[in-house]
């Protein structure tokens, strides 16, 4: 009986696969190059674990960890990191980022969850540029999968 309950309670989690993640990184890198910008790009699975990453020549060293943390946060919280950042700026809308109890959580714009068939399958994050540029490039990667 216990075995049946365990099996009945399990749920399959969809994840973005490597080929999709690589396509996202390639498209974002191509657009950043077209704009003469350099950034770090991270694509994570539904759990926030890294699948694909690129740091363009000239991107700040700090952008490496920040991009990975943005992807991790967006996937785990199923929200854009900018939205999380807005809540921590205004305690009446949410709470301090330290509430999460994990230094990986970030509230800077540029991390966006990837939704497919009503479920988060991963996240795309960009770091190293202005917040608006990070968001715009990450959104380009999300649109690549959402539009397919």
What residue spans do the PLM features occupy?
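Flexible, solvent-exposed loop/hinge segments and secondary-structure transition points
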Residues: 9-148
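Short, Lys/Arg-enriched N-terminal segments with co-localized hydrophobic residues
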Residues: 1-9
